[in-house]
Structures are given as C-alpha cells and as structure tokens.
A protein has these predicted regions:
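Conserved ABC ATPase "signature" region
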Residues: 33-50, 158-159
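Conserved catalytic motifs of ABC-family nucleotide-binding domains
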Residues: 76
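Hydrophobic anchor residue at the start of the ABC signature
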Residues: 69
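C-terminal boundary and immediately downstream tail of ABC-type ATPase nucleotide-binding domains
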Residues: 147-175
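Conserved ABC ATPase signature
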Residues: 55-59, 63
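A short, surface-exposed alpha-helical micro-motif characterized by mixed small hydrophobic
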Residues: 122-124
Length: 175
C-alpha cells in the first residue's frame, strides 16, 4: 500500500474493477466470488458497497486509501507492505487508519512492514522498529513506552518529532 493512493490506481476504473484486478490474476475465483470478496473487503475497511461504482476522483483521500488497503487484503497476503501509507492523510484520518490496520491485523493475521519517518506512528502501531541509514539497518529495537536510539540516524529521527504541544519560550522585551 503506497503513500500516494491516487497514483496507485487507474482513475478511469471503478472501485469494483480496482478490487477485482488482483483477484483475477492471483486467485482462482469465479467472477461472482470475486464480487462477493470485494464487498467483504470493503466492509473490512469500513466502507460499504455504495463505493463500488465510483471512480477514484469521486472518493476522499481516506476512502481511496482504504480502497487500496482492501485491494491489498483481497488476495490474503501473509505480509502487507505499507510504504508511508498514512503520510498524506490528516492526523484524524491517520489515527483512524492505524486503528483499522490493528483491527485488520487481528482479523486476517497479516504481518505488516510499516515504512515511515514518523516515530509517533511507530509507537502507536509497531512492535519492533528498524532504523536504516543509506540502505543499511543500523539499529533494531522492540517498541516500548519511549523510543530512544543510540545510532546517529535514529537520533536524527527522534529529534525530528514535533512535540505534542508547542513549546512556549519566554521572551524579555525592552521598551
């Protein structure tokens, strides 16, 4: 599942066609079974059949990202790769998609490789974190209450996290 859901789908196809495409190529299902599976996957990502005949430009960013999740899950993968999959969403939608991913992990037993630069998302979703620098893994740790890194690359990520609330600075003004 990619960061840019708009580029990940053909804008001229309907959601029904988008969901059926991987099933046609990767599963031995009849058309009626594919359609039933498409409907089931939409329900799993909190969408209903009313979106089946819509095209991507008619959907919100959050809806389209959930369609992409449904498409990926339709073929029952053992591993789901999420490449910055919530980066283009606002914080409310990010939180909703993270909750949805946790639910889907439990429901389908699918492992997730969650690629992100946002450590707040790592803390909310992941059990283990690996830090990469120039294509090499430089640090691995279990995600606990507070992530602290020893590698330079890990500390750069850690220092890039914005505080939950703005920090007020005291200023002294001479009049």
């Amino acid at each position: 599942v990619f960061q840019d859901s708009i580029s990940a789908v053909n804008p001229r196809k309907t959601v029904r066609e988008i969901l059926r495409e991987p099933m046609r190529h990767l599963l031995s299902l009849k058309k009626s079974e594919q359609l039933a599976r498409a409907s089931e996957m939409l329900k799993a990502v909190d969408l209903d059949d009313s979106v089946l005949d819509k095209r991507p430009p008619q959907l919100s960013g959050g809806q389209l990202q959930r369609v992409c999740l449904a498409r990926a899950l339709a073929v029952e993968p053992k591993l789901l790769i999420l490449d910055e999959a919530v980066s283009n969403l606002d914080l409310v939608l990010q939180a909703g998609v993270i909750r949805l991913l946790k639910k889907l992990q439990q429901q389908f037993g699918t492992a997730c490789l969650f690629i992100t630069h946002d450590l707040r998302l790592v803390e909310r979703f992941c059990q283990r974190v690996m830090v990469m620098d120039n294509g090499q893994i430089v640090e691995t740790q279990v995600v606990g209450e507070k992530l602290t890194f020893s590698s330079d690359a890990g500390r750069v990520l850690q220092n890039a996290v914005l505080p939950a609330f703005p920090v007020r600075r005291r200023t002294t003004e001479k009049v």
